[in-house]
Regions:
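Alpha4 helix (beta4-alpha4-beta5 surface) of REC/receiver domains from two-component response regulators
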Residues: 62, 82-101, 107-114
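Active-site residues of response regulator receiver
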Residues: 52, 80
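Charged docking surfaces used in two-component/phosphorelay signaling
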Residues: 15-23
């Protein structure tokens, strides 16, 4: 089973994303900030890191950088309203990540996750 770790500080958004991905057959573990997600990544492997960029305690770009140091094969997708931040980022993991700009429909999220994991 494909394992997704989700980091999103908005409780409602995190719940919507988690339910949509679980309904699509994915195992999802979610956290409200990058720091907690990073601690979990250190404990067990995941197939995909799905993360917001702007979060408390550790932003999504830093989370992606640290997570890719632990697992260079980890696929990364940013969900954000701040796509320009990614375009100007000098972190290699962020440059190779897929970006899904908010707002988006949940079916678009599932389709993009499927496409990324199939690559």
């Amino acid at each position: 089973m494909r394992r997704i770790i989700l980091a999103e500080d908005d409780d409602s958004m995190r719940g919507f994303l988690e339910r949509a991905l679980e309904r699509a057959g994915y195992y999802v573990v979610s956290f409200a900030n990058g720091e907690e997600a990073y601690e979990r990544i250190k404990q067990e492997p995941f197939t995909l890191l799905l993360t917001d960029i702007v979060m408390p305690r550790m932003d999504g770009i830093e989370l992606a950088r640290k997570a890719s140091e632990i697992d260079p094969e980890l696929k990364i997708m940013f969900i954000t309203g701040f796509a320009a931040v990614i375009l100007n980022c000098d972190v290699a993991a962020a440059k190779e990540a897929h970006v899904l700009s908010k707002p988006f429909h949940l079916k678009d999220l599932v389709r993009e996750v499927e496409r990324l994991l199939a690559a």
